[in-house]
Curated annotation (Swiss-Prot):
Organism field: Nitrobacter hamburgensis (strain DSM 10229 / NCIMB 13809 / X14)
Keyword Lipid biosynthesis recorded: yes
Annotated function: Component of the acetyl coenzyme A carboxylase (ACC) complex. Biotin carboxylase (BC) catalyzes the carboxylation of biotin on its carrier protein (BCCP) and then the CO(2) group is transferred by the transcarboxylase to acetyl-CoA to form malonyl-CoA.
Protein name: Acetyl-coenzyme A carboxylase carboxyl transferase subunit beta
Record's keyword terms, sorted: ATP-binding, Cytoplasm, Fatty acid biosynthesis, Fatty acid metabolism, Lipid biosynthesis, Lipid metabolism, Nucleotide-binding, Transferase
Quaternary assembly: Acetyl-CoA carboxylase is a heterohexamer composed of biotin carboxyl carrier protein (AccB), biotin carboxylase (AccC) and two subunits each of ACCase subunit alpha (AccA) and ACCase subunit beta (AccD).
NCBIfam families per the UniProt record, alphabetical: accD (TIGR00515)
Matches recorded under SUPFAM superfamilies: ClpP/crotonase
Biological process annotations from GO: fatty acid biosynthetic process; malonyl-CoA biosynthetic process
Domain of life of the native organism: Bacteria
UniProt-recorded Gene Ontology molecular function terms: acetyl-CoA carboxylase activity; ATP binding; carboxyl- or carbamoyltransferase activity
Gene symbol of the encoding locus: accD
Compositionally biased region (Low complexity): 284-295, 304-314
Length: 314
């Protein structure tokens, strides 16, 4: 028995560990139930049953919005990686390197240009997995460049906000991005193009004092935490108990801070409809079916790769 217990059984455990992916199961933060990862992924990262909206990566978000899951990555300007030579427990440059390795992103905001139900649109996505989606110089440049591109292309701009606020490691250079992005939003307005904001979980801090609350239409995902300061800080400041659901998407909708709360499965058609209404563009009809007299239908073309060239066409 000692040989079976001490040698064979540990080897079997090691084999099973190697064959089992670490993210095979996901625990729902709302109900605590374990759900198969692939079921959540195929459901746009919404937990089946509880409808809890998990965070989405920037690439997954862009795939869920653009036609045929295809878009052009917008080339973004380079900025100084560590302007203040900041260090706390670790060097800021090391934190940036780790975040880039973890997410595959250059910074917390990714911008894409593509088609949404046949119409051109620029979409910016904040990825919370990159240092909490914090707003620094690179993220601010990405938002501004996306808005400039929307003006150039004369098309709507959609931003998916998910952030813990300004990036403290960049100090006042991070805070400067609040007025810069606000001015860029005004530039888009003067060009007569729609600016649509989708608030996801969580959207807090400095971004709520700038571009995240300036949309022509404010949309929120169900249950998203949205606010400037945390609920505990507010309670300690005003010395009063806050109401249930305070700073959640549904509470903000009921009190006029957002226009609508939209389930993730309904976001794409909702955004397409809003873009058509705000640009007064006609609805694009589906391609007509071939006549019965046609000999053979054309061969279907496979969908292109998700990530296309690095810059949109002129």
């Amino acid at each position: 028995m000692n040989w079976l217990t001490n040698v064979v059984r540990p080897k079997i455990r090691n084999i099973l560990k190697r064959e089992t992916p670490e993210n095979l199961w996901i625990k729902c933060p709302d109900t605590g139930q374990l759900v198969f990862y692939k079921d959540v992924e195929s459901n746009q990262f919404v937990i089946p049953g509880s409808n809890y909206h998990m965070r989405m990566s920037a690439d997954a978000r862009l795939r869920s919005i653009f036609d045929n899951e295809t878009w052009y990555d917008v080339a973004l300007p380079e900025v100084t990686a560590d302007p203040l030579k900041f260090r706390d427990e670790r060097k800021y440059v090391d934190r940036i390197k780790d975040a880039r390795t973890k997410t595959g992103l250059h910074d917390s905001v990714k911008v894409g240009f593509g088609k949404l139900e046949g119409a051109g649109v620029v979409v910016a996505v904040q990825d919370f997995d990159f240092m909490g989606g914090s707003l620094g110089m690179a993220a601010g440049e990405a938002i501004v460049r996306g808005l400039e591109l929307a003006v150039e292309k004369q098309c709507p701009f959609i931003v998916f906000a998910a952030s813990g606020g300004a990036r403290m490691q960049e100090g006042v250079l991070s805070l400067m991005q609040l007025p810069r992005t606000t001015v860029a939003v005004q530039m888009l307005r003067e060009a007569g193009q729609p600016y649509i904001v989708v608030l996801t979980n969580p959207t807090t801090g400095g971004v709520t004092a700038s571009y995240a609350m300036l949309g022509d239409v404010q949309i929120a995902e169900p249950g998203a935490l949205i606010g400037f300061a945390g609920a505990r800080v507010i309670e300690q400041t005003i010395r009063e108990k806050l109401p249930n659901g305070f700073q959640r998407a549904e509470y903000l909708r009921d009190h006029g801070m957002v226009d609508m709360v939209v389930h993730r499965h309904d976001l794409r058609p909702t955004l397409a409809r809003l873009c058509r209404l705000l640009t007064k563009a006609p609805e694009i009809d589906a391609a007509p079916e071939p006549s019965p007299a046609a000999e053979e239908p054309a061969e279907p073309m496979p969908a292109p790769e998700a990530a296309a060239p690095s810059a949109p066409p002129a």
